[in-house]
């Protein structure tokens, strides 16, 4: 049986299996058939702004209908909005057509349960098993119905605003927002301006091809430049589907996911709101954040890379805060998935209440330098049996001593080997990363 699901749903190049119309048709039928085993079912489908979303939306819709499942179409919608709306519309599942921070040539799909949580490993296995079966349509009298939901944007906008302390206001704050020409393009202004902020939006004119193109959470140069040019208080960058958040301080410096998690954790602990006094992160989480949390007697729990694994551990440990340096931040007391919009509001609430700048808020954490290198691969590489790589890693770890570390892993969403060298000293980190990447040349 093929394993189609990676760490964040199914993703790949458009037109190459499994990102094809015929596969998505079969996928819709497979998921629908699994859901229909519990009785009459309905799903909602949202998508980001890439051009191929229209193709795959129609294919999934047809697959669900052929399994007897009703389909509510949302149109362009952030991933976390679909997670929320799945619950408010009382759907059995939510579907997002997106490749997150990737460019328009890629696409993919993610699924949420009726509770707004990403499908479990067991759910994914049931779907993959159904994909091996012949596609048998329901009878003509049992075909599902399709319809378009009215005003889903308004519901999500009001929900986002409700997570911000309404005794506070963003009045007087000048904020630049980069929507990555993605799914937040028609939402971000309303959320932040209605809470009082002066908003300047960039990269909010999607054309189907410019999603994440030199913009958004994975490419913040434009945002940093505009923050400085307009002398803004801060900048906010989302990725293509709105589940990631990176911020820029008033000096044009990046504030990444680990720093933002620390800012929230410190504030919530001081207010007695950090349930179980724990934060969940991944093996890529910055050492500086770990040490800063330790100094506050906040427990840090490490899991594998992927916000699904972070969420699973948060549920096990009773934690309400977790995430990744890439900007996936989960505030489980506010919502059920990583949500860039809601995470930004939590940081802004801390900023307003403390009357501090973003630069001041991040000073309590001394971030280590992380040098990240992605190595493209054509065929699968067995990292455990790669003698040259292991030897190079030993040499780099000896060079780092107790002042750093090495993480090498295969990407769960792309054909890449990801190398990360972390150290207090930037020069040493760069030297170590170069040595490891040279193994693949």
From Swiss-Prot:
Protein keywords: Isomerase, Magnesium, Metal-binding, Phosphoprotein
Enzyme Commission number(s): 5.4.2.10
Reactions this protein catalyses: alpha-D-glucosamine 1-phosphate = D-glucosamine 6-phosphate
GO terms, biological process: carbohydrate metabolic process; peptidoglycan biosynthetic process; UDP-N-acetylglucosamine biosynthetic process
Pfam families per UniProt: PGM_PMM_I, PGM_PMM_II, PGM_PMM_III, PGM_PMM_IV
Residues annotated as catalytic: 100 (phosphoserine intermediate)
PTM comment, free text: Activated by phosphorylation.
Enzyme class: isomerase
Residues annotated with Phosphoserine modification: 100
Cofactor note: Binds 1 Mg(2+) ion per subunit.
GO cellular component: cytosol
Cofactor: Mg(2+)
UniProt-recorded Gene Ontology molecular function terms: magnesium ion binding; phosphoglucosamine mutase activity; phosphomannomutase activity
Gene3D superfamilies from the UniProt entry: Alpha-D-Glucose-1,6-Bisphosphate, subunit A, domain 3, Alpha-D-phosphohexomutase, C-terminal domain
Stored InterPro entries: A-D-PHexomutase_a/b/a-I, A-D-PHexomutase_a/b/a-I/II/III, A-D-PHexomutase_a/b/a-II, A-D-PHexomutase_a/b/a-III, A-D-PHexomutase_C, A-D-PHexomutase_C_sf, Alpha-D-phosphohexomutase_SF, GlmM_bact
Cysteine pairings via disulfide bonds: none
Binding site for Mg(2+): 100, 239, 241, 243
Function: Catalyzes the conversion of glucosamine-6-phosphate to glucosamine-1-phosphate.
Family named by the database record: Belongs to the phosphohexose mutase family.
Name this protein carries in UniProt: Phosphoglucosamine mutase
């Amino acid at each position: 049986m093929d394993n189609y699901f990676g760490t964040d749903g199914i993703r790949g190049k458009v037109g190459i299996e499994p990102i094809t119309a015929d596969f998505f048709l079969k996928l819709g039928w497979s998921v629908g058939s699994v859901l229909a085993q519990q009785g009459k079912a309905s799903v909602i489908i949202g998508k980001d702004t890439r051009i191929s979303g229209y193709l795959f939306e129609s294919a999934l819709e047809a697959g669900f209908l052929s399994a007897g499942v009703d389909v509510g179409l949302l149109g362009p919608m952030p991933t976390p909005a679909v997670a929320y709306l799945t619950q408010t519309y009382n759907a059995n599942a939510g579907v997002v057509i997106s490749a997150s921070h990737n460019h328009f040539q890629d696409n993919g799909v993610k699924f949420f349960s009726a509770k707004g949580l990403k499908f479990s490993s067991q759910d994914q296995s049931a779907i993959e098993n159904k994909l091996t079966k012949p596609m048998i349509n329901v009878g003509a009298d049992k075909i599902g119905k399709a319809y378009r939901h009215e005003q889903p944007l308004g519901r999500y906008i009001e929900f986002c605003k409700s997570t911000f302390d309404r005794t506070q206001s963003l009045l007087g704050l000048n904020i630049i927002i980069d929507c990555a020409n993605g799914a937040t393009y028609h939402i971000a202004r309303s959320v932040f301006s209605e809470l009082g902020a002066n908003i300047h939006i960039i990269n909010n004119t999607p054309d189907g091809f410019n999603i994440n193109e030199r913009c958004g959470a994975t490419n913040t140069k434009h945002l940093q430049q505009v923050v400085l040019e307009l002398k803004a208080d801060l900048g906010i960058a989302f990725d293509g589907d709105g589940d990631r958040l990176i911020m820029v301080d008033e000096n044009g410096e990046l504030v990444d996911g680990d720093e933002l998690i620390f800012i929230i954790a410190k504030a919530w602990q001081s207010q007695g709101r950090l349930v179980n006094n724990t934060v969940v992160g991944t093996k890529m989480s910055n050492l500086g954040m770990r040490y800063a949390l330790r100094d506050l007697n906040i427990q840090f729990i490490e899991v594998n890379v992927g916000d699904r694994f972070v969420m699973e551990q948060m549920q096990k440990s009773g934690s309400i805060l977790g995430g990744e340096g890439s900007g996936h931040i989960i505030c489980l007391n506010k919502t059920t998935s990583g949500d860039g919009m809601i995470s930004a509001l939590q940081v802004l609430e801390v900023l307003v209440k403390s009357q501090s700048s973003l630069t001041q808020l991040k000073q309590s954490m001394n971030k280590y330098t992380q040098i990240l290198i992605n190595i493209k691969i054509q065929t699968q590489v067995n990292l455990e049996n790669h003698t040259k790589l292991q030897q190079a890693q030993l040499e780099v770890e000896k060079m780092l001593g107790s002042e750093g570390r090495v993480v090498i892993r295969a990407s769960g969403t792309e054909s890449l080997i990801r190398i990360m060298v972390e150290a207090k000293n930037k020069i040493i980190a760069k030297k170590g990363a170069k040595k490891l990447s040279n193994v693949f040349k």
